[in-house]
Design a protein with these regions (language model features):
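Mixed-charge (acidic/basic) macromolecular-recognition segments
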Residues: 20-31, 35
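Long, contiguous interaction/recruitment modules in multidomain scaffold/adaptor proteins
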Residues: 1-23
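Structural signature of tandem alpha-helical TPR/SEL1-like repeats
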Residues: 33-46, 67-80, 87, 101-114, ...
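Short, Lys/Arg-enriched, Trp-marked, Pro/Gly-tolerant hinge/linker segments that flank
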Residues: 16-19, 64, 72
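Conserved alpha-helical positions within TPR/SEL1-like repeat arrays
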Residues: 26-30, 56-66, 90-97, 124-131
Length: 154
């Protein structure tokens, strides 16, 4: 039911795209994500052509690329977002996931820790870092983060 509304909104926005600034392209990307992820990626790329410093466009483009299996490219966009906004918890969290997918657990732990330094209530970051600590044999750290995770979700 929402998809046709989102499509109509996106079609109307595309018709006015010549007038868009970076934020307009970013907003169009948000509208398109649910119905046309490929077009959403294009909209985020256009936003970044107009404003290479748009951290949220980097994060969202990175997430869509990651979902497409382009993990290295996603990692690059998450890092660019963090360069623009070092306290972007979502960028740091998503970077952690990408680094896990690239089998870089130590770097993933650092990314999750950066996300938690910005937002200690990110339950999923606590869970993911607990799993990684368990994997590398740091049982006490794993238990500490698992306990925090349970407190946050329980």
């Amino acid at each position: 039911r929402a998809a046709p509304i989102a499509r109509r909104t996106a079609q109307a926005a595309r018709a006015a795209a010549d007038e868009f600034d970076a934020e307009g392209w970013y907003e169009l990307g948000l509208e398109l994500e649910a119905v046309e992820p490929g077009e959403a990626r294009d909209a985020y790329r256009r936003a970044l052509e107009l404003d290479a410093h748009h951290a949220d466009a980097h994060v969202n483009l990175g997430r869509l690329l990651h979902e497409q299996g382009l993990v290295e490219e996603a990692e690059r966009h998450y890092r660019l977002a963090l360069r623009e906004d070092p306290d972007h918890a979502t960028a740091a969290f998503n970077l952690g996931i990408a680094l896990e997918d690239l089998d870089q657990p130590a770097d993933a732990i650092e990314a999750y820790r950066a996300a938690l330094a910005t937002d200690p209530r990110l339950a999923d970051a606590h869970y993911n870092v607990a799993r990684l600590y368990e994997r590398i044999g740091k049982k006490a750290a794993a238990l500490r983060h698992l306990s925090i995770y349970r407190r946050l979700v329980g």
